[in-house]
Structure formats: structure tokens, C-alpha cells
Amino acid sequence: VQENFAKAFDSDGISANGYTPTLTIPRSGILGDIVLKSADEVQAFLRATNQKRFSNGSVSNYLPSTLEKQFVALTLSVKFDAWDSNFSASTVLLGSLKVVNFRIGTNTVPTIQDVLDQTKKFLDGDSSYSLRLASGGGVLSAGELTKLVDNLNLSFDGSPYGSVWAQANLGL
């Protein structure tokens, strides 16, 4: 994170001229978004606990939810993979893998990037959030969405072929 955050999150290519790379965690209502502007802030956010809460320019004494932390971790993985062709051995971008046992709305098979976009909507309280199981039922709850993003984060942790969950749920 320390080495690559500024480069991978520098969307306009001019950070040397004053642009600050950011990773934004949406929050609904009047709370306002949490904006992480450095690798140090990302690491502090991910390490925050009840005993050591997170503070920066956008929040003070904040305890991130597990879903918010999982969202940040998956965002880092997808962004680093897209930015650095050597991030993984695969030629397929992480964000473009399909999450085959889930749907957006009733028919669309989401990619990992789509799951991130839906997670943003969920965190922001956006009524267009529509991620669900392919087998039917309502939209995923906070707990179900957290578990999905956690599984995505763990999918290739320590295994070049993916976890058992990844092998059953991810495809091209």
C-alpha cells in the first residue's frame, strides 16, 4: 500500500502538481463520505479498533464497520491489479471476473467491479442497490454483503488458483 497508493489512485496523472490521490468510502445521510488521501490513512483505517479509532480530515474518532474495511481492501486489490500488470500472474483483470452466483437486479451477472459499485450504493444508502443471490430472494443484507466482499478479498490469498469459494463463484 505504502509504495503504490499514490500512483494507483492518481486518476488524472498530475499528483506532482498538487492532485491528492483519494479513496472514498461513501456514507449515507448527513454523515458525509470518508476520504482517505494517503497510504498511511488507508492503513490506519484498516487497523482501526474500538481501542484505537480512526481520525483524519473527514472523520474523527471513527470506528469503521467490517463492510467498510472490506470495501477498502477490495478496492485496493482491484485498483492495484488494474494499475500494475505485475500485480498478479493472471492476464485477466480482477475487477472483470464475474461473480456467477449473484445478480444485479434480476438478470445481470456482476463482475467484481460491479460488486464494488453495488457496495458503494449500499454504504451510501442508494435506493438503486440491487445485489442479490442468483437463486432469488431479496437484496443482500449488510451481513450477506460483508460476507461476499470478504470472500472476494480472500479468494486468491495464498493460492494462485483461488479458494474453494472462488472456484465455485468466480468465472470469466
Model regions and ranges:
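Soluble extracellular-acting proteins and domains
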Residues: 1-172
